[in-house]
């Protein structure tokens, strides 16, 4: 009987406390980066001093610490990057996560001994691209989230000597593996410089349009007109022209049909609430049920997204995915309780993404831009225990009579 190799469990860390929690709850490695050069410029406590402390603690515990440098730099950051990464490399991180070919070339030339992991930002979707990067000297590929399980398996078969990393949990981007321009367009904040404002999560109002019979120009159709979105353009114009009584008619409904010009006839219903509509809001990735398959494929590392998430998020995801990996290696069947434990985290609804090629509307949450989970609320962190008393740093309100789950590396209990 062949013994399966356990994939590395890789967790995010936005602070030293979150790094320690990730290790305590089962992570083999964490990733963190300098705010200026990673894609998390906000809510990121890892300055140079913290990176040094983190790397030292990781190695003392037999764990790994990867430094994220996956921005796509403009000219002014190329020179400063090489200057600022030098003291980081002197601290002996276990690898750099990078996306830009130019920076990869420069790091390889100056520090050829440093392992380079190719970021998901590089959009690696086939085995030929993996071989290309292998020839360049990259030691691990973080595969694009757009791949199915079968495609991942094919890459493993064609590239048996390359380390492969796959995202299994966390936020998904509407754009192709994070290459999004929305934030730059609306706020002049470049997502690929680490300053994404998550414009895809905002609510967007919609209005129908019709041609002004006098000018021939497009004009908005007020919601109090008798406008049927299923009618042809000609019928819509006639309806708009004929209706001027200012009354909202029964057949008018706040249900819109969105049609992409390149796919005529494929209508997508858009629901609007009092805040707007959410046509770009992706659900969150949850692939815990596929850990067994990914382990059998031979994926080297399973990654959780979320450097800006809470300590509770880091602890829970580390604990759940650790159990899933251990079960897969031991040959135990998948435990559905792991899904319910992840359901308690704040989330936008879950999807397995493109791993199992579900219908397209399974990936998006059109109803709301806010969390649809959050059945559990993070109420506090135990900071110290002495003489039977616990010092708790409160994060949210809780009251006498509330059921509180205490999660601990040795086991959870409800009090």
Pin down the residues of each PLM region.
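Surface-exposed amphipathic alpha-helical tracts and adjacent flexible/coil segments at the periphery
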Residues: 2-25, 29-36, 55, 61-85, ...
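Glycine-rich, positively charged N-terminal anion/phosphate-binding segment
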Residues: 40-57
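Alpha-helix capping/helix-boundary segments
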Residues: 102-103
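Basic, amphipathic alpha-helical recognition segments used for DNA target recognition
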Residues: 106
């Amino acid at each position: 009987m062949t013994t399966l190799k356990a994939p590395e469990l890789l967790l995010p860390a936005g602070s030293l406390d979150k790094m320690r929690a990730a290790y305590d709850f089962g992570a083999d490695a964490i990733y963190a980066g300098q705010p200026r050069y990673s894609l998390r410029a906000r809510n990121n406590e890892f300055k140079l001093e913290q990176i040094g402390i983190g790397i030292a603690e990781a190695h003392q515990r037999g764990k790994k610490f990867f430094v994220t440098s996956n921005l796509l730099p403009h000219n002014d950051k190329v020179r400063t990057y090489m200057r600022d990464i030098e003291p980081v490399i002197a601290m002996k991180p276990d690898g750099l996560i990078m996306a830009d070919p130019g920076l990869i070339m420069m790091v390889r030339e100056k520090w050829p001994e440093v392992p380079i992991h190719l970021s998901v930002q590089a959009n690696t979707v086939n085995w030929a691209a993996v071989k290309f990067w292998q020839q360049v000297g990259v030691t691990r590929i973080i595969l694009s989230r757009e791949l199915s399980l079968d495609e991942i398996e094919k890459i493993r078969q064609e590239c048996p000597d390359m380390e492969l990393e796959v995202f299994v949990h966390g936020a998904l981007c509407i754009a192709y593996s994070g290459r999004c321009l929305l934030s730059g367009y609306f706020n002049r904040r470049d997502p690929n410089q680490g300053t994404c404002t998550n414009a895809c999560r905002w609510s967007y109002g919609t209005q129908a349009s019709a041609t002004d019979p006098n000018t021939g120009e497009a004009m908005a159709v007020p919601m109090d007109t008798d406008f049927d979105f299923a009618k042809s353009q000609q019928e819509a114009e006639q309806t708009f022209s004929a209706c001027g009584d200012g009354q909202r008619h029964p057949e008018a409904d706040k249900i819109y049909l969105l049609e992409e010009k390149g796919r005529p006839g494929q209508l997508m219903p858009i629901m609007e609430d009092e805040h707007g509509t959410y046509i770009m809001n992706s659900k969150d990735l949850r692939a815990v049920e596929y850990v067994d398959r990914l382990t059998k494929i031979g994926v080297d590392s399973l990654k959780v997204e979320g450097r800006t998430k809470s300590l509770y998020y880091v602890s829970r995801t580390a604990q759940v995915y650790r159990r899933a990996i251990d079960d897969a290696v031991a040959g135990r069947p998948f435990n559905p309780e792991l899904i319910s434990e992840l359901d308690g985290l704040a989330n936008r609804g879950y999807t397995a993404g493109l791993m199992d090629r579900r219908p397209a509307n399974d990936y998006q949450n059109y109803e709301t831009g806010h969390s649809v989970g959050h059945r559990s609320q993070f109420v506090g962190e135990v900071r110290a225990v002495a003489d039977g008393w616990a010092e708790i740093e409160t994060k949210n309100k809780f009251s006498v009579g509330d059921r509180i789950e205490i999660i601990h590396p040795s086991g959870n209990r409800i009090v």
